[in-house]
């Protein structure tokens, strides 16, 4: 039975019902719909629609219903109801009879679903924050284990300058901390209660919406009914935050996939996060990381979907908004499993220090140090840059690192070079010089790690 049948002289076609019904998606809002209905029963009691006894009877029946669907969630989809609101209301009527028909007084499914969705976003958002913080902790623990392992840093995927592996870990800590901050901000903006704004013009009953908001755990009520029932900014914003976070996850996955490759051999991944080949018995594939990278596009698609759905909707509510949930639910599911999987990958990751050090010593990563050495001797940097470029050309031709050149050969490029030049060409020197705030010198990395660990306690 539909909640709106009185206006119509014939029933909906089976095809329209299949097309229109949203229960297969919005059943996930059952807890929020029941909690909102319990609060609404209290609100309409305060304005005289229900007696205290009726309110208690309705609220008790709703609590019983919540227990039943938690124990047997299959009851929801088996009901054949149009949507989760219809399921809850019809189930309530089945329990308490005509009294259940009073519950929807002054309420529309428009403010009802807006409330359900915000309650769901608030709850699930808190779970995502916990997962983000767990991933941050996994990175911090990895940084502690492998802080002083030396590896090549890259620009353009070409070896550039040596960095500490702990510095690499802390780079991603910075990214995920921004994700935490963004999501916390989004949840603050979502912390306003839509209930009591009706279909679009507000409710005709003089209820205390501040008290209603407080009863549902919101910071305050919304202030404009037209905006309230048509607002899905919180969905867009959470999908956007998830997309940015998935970008960070995908970048980290890409780094680790490369580090794990036979060509690099920088890290080993645990067997529990890898798989093999059905044909090639030697293969150990980084499937967990590849799936994180793959699921990122899926999350982006949901963000574009909700933006496109909302971009041309007039005030106030439109049925298009029914399409807001499937993408949101998929975003949150995908984001959550990727955060969990990334943390698991990091927990078992081991750095092959000999390989990372060997790679850092190749590719003339100490060229910048030689240029800085010349600057310290009084040569303008642009000239020093040119001189070192010529040295590198000769080094490549002779297939030897800069530190293997004899002094007289280096002096043929500049007479200001003396025997102390070799002190600046070591890997250790390359790291030690980067001691300004944010640099990769080991004391800086240790200090940054200590600060992050203290903040995470």
Swiss-Prot record:
EC number(s) given by UniProt: 4.3.2.1
| Pathway stated in the Swiss-Prot or TrEMBL entry | Amino-acid biosynthesis; L-arginine biosynthesis; L-arginine from L-ornithine and carbamoyl phosphate: step 3/3
Q: Which PROSITE patterns match?
A: FUMARATE_LYASES (PS00163)
Q: What SUPFAM superfamilies is this protein classified in?
A: L-aspartase-like (SSF48557)
What is a GO molecular function of this protein? argininosuccinate lyase activity
Pfam families noted in UniProt:
ASL_C2, Lyase_1
**What does the sequence similarity comment in the record state about its family?**
Belongs to the lyase 1 family. Argininosuccinate lyase subfamily.
* Protein name (Swiss-Prot/TrEMBL): Argininosuccinate lyase
Organism annotation: Shewanella sediminis (strain HAW-EB3)
**Taxonomic classification:** Bacteria, Pseudomonadati, Pseudomonadota, Gammaproteobacteria, Alteromonadales
